[in-house]
Amino acid sequence: MNFYQANLAILALVNACFFLYRHRPRNHKPCHRSTQEDEPKEVIAVRFQRQFLLVYTLVVAADWLQGPYTYAVYKYEKQLAEQTVALLYAFGFVSGAASAPFAGQLADHYGRRTACVAYCVCYGITCLAMLSYNLKILYVGRFFGGIATTLLFSVFEAWMITEYHLSRLEETRVSLCTVFASMTTISSITAVCSGVLGDGLVQYCDSSLAPFLASLGCCIGAGIFILAAWRENYGSTETCKGSPESQTLKLRMLVTLVNPQVAALVFASCCFEGSMYLFVFFWPAALGSARVKSGYQDDLPLGLIFSSFMCAMMAGSSISTTRNALFSNSITMDTLSFIFIIASAAFAVSTMLGHEHLLFWAFCVIEGCVGIYFPRMALIKSNVVDDSVRGGVYSTLRLPLNIFVVVVHSLDRDGQGPSKPFHFPRIQ
């Protein structure tokens, strides 16, 4: 068993221990007798969680399935120049930034469930566009891909939180904290499984386009289930364009965005998630450079390393649900600040490490921080943003992040590491 296999086994064991701890038998002493009304509400809560997480699994699978192969299809199957590939990637981020200010507002007005279906349609168009060799169609695909990414990180969460509140599930055992942590864990597991499935499809079909068709299937399945099982919710009901209620809603959104707490969240998410995006793009080159300096010439086991990172992130999401950290919003704020410090220290240390194995461990710490960050940030946003403007605010929060990523990527230059990038989509 080599170094990376041993680390993956240890991280998998740690996650197994967390799983057993979270699902251990408990002897609850109820403070009141359960009534006939309590039991149906618990059933409704469990059904709500399962219905949402099933759809969420499909939509993140659609994202993860195609991510590792986008660059390969552009560069090697379609024989596009490196500069053209870079422009296609940048166009997707620009599209996401341009759609951020209004995508969520439209979701609030026309319905979050409708917006979730729109994500499936947009991402389906992105997958179909990859089958074409026409450069204009490829740009159209990236355009819809940017919109889909904005919708993925805003409307699904907005629908879930609002539906949770409308169903009055706060008193059940299914807490928002649990749902947020499950989302991060599912994203990690789906990433690993999608990587294995995608590789198998490529080998079986002898084409890097096969994962995009599988991704299209996930979008179709998610869209059908949303229409069949989800009910619609809105940012505000019975508001017409130009009406006083509509103006009040716009004012409420503006007040929310200029709220110091929300402004702090915008800055924090831009810095942390922006750094995360850059890390996703550049960790293979960093580890590859360290390996070359160590005198090794064989290729990195990128699949094992990526699986280890996902296990580290799963462990972080499990830590985020520990009992002592879920009850107080101030505790959540303090924990998030502590995570920023740890992640910053890990990034700083990684720039000074020349040993491949030490660098890998520093990267695992960063991924663990990512696993803690997303459930905590989601919990804070659910508390400070009103349901009536949640979709619009959530999508607008992604505007600075997309601008940051586009600007930084326009300034990056190749270093001494491997020249061929290894692209994954997102980490949530």
List PLM regions with ranges.
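Symmetry-related core transmembrane helices of the 12-TM Major Facilitator Superfamily/SLC fold
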Residues: 4-17, 187, 209-228, 421-428
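Short amphipathic helix-loop junctions that connect adjacent transmembrane helices
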Residues: 62-83, 281-300, 350
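C-terminal ends and interior cores of transmembrane alpha-helices
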Residues: 121-138, 341-354
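Cytoplasmic membrane-interface "Motif A"-like loop-to-helix N-cap segments
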Residues: 109-120, 325-340, 419
